């Protein structure tokens, strides 16, 4: 069952925790890819110097952050990579959740060929973990890029998120790669499924 619209109309911290264990579904040329969300980070623009929307900063790039929760926000970094975020909250809240890592669930050869031009069985143990254990890696594996910006995630299409009833132990800690963010460096707004081998960093 697809997560409904109301799921996303909450605080980014709630959504970030709630997304753990949920299933990201991607359809590419008739192939269905599914990945369990195992690591997330919350960003709350009004108080968060790590957020693209800090202090109400509103540009063409950050506009998705100010929409109602339940759409995709995809941005480009370092001129090379994409990052996939889920918008949370109400209109004008400036909140979102970065999807940091997935555990691939099926079509392993398809994903492996996308990432490393090899079949899954040909990959080393390290390379198998590297398929989707980071925000840009999962975007490459699932072909998520700027064309997916603003996509609605609570309706069936080529990118959406399904519910899951499984329960997990969750670790809460600080976020990664935000050394510029002053006091926000210490906000414990990263969440991951404990002991999952696909998380980007403990």
Swiss-Prot record:
Record organism: Clostridium botulinum (strain Alaska E43 / Type E3)
Source organism, top-level taxon: Bacteria
Listed GO MF terms: alkylbase DNA N-glycosylase activity; DNA binding
Xref: Gene3D superfamilies: Methylpurine-DNA glycosylase (MPG)
Enzyme class of the recorded protein, top EC level: hydrolase
Transmembrane region(s): none
Family: Belongs to the DNA glycosylase MPG family.
UniProt-listed NCBIfam families: 3mg (TIGR00567), PRK00802.1-1 (NF002001)
EC number: 3.2.2.-
Any one GO BP annotation for this protein: base-excision repair
Cited InterPro entries: Formyl_transferase-like_C_sf, MPG, MPG_sf
Intrachain disulfide bonds: none
Protein name: Putative 3-methyladenine DNA glycosylase
Keywords: DNA damage, DNA repair, Hydrolase
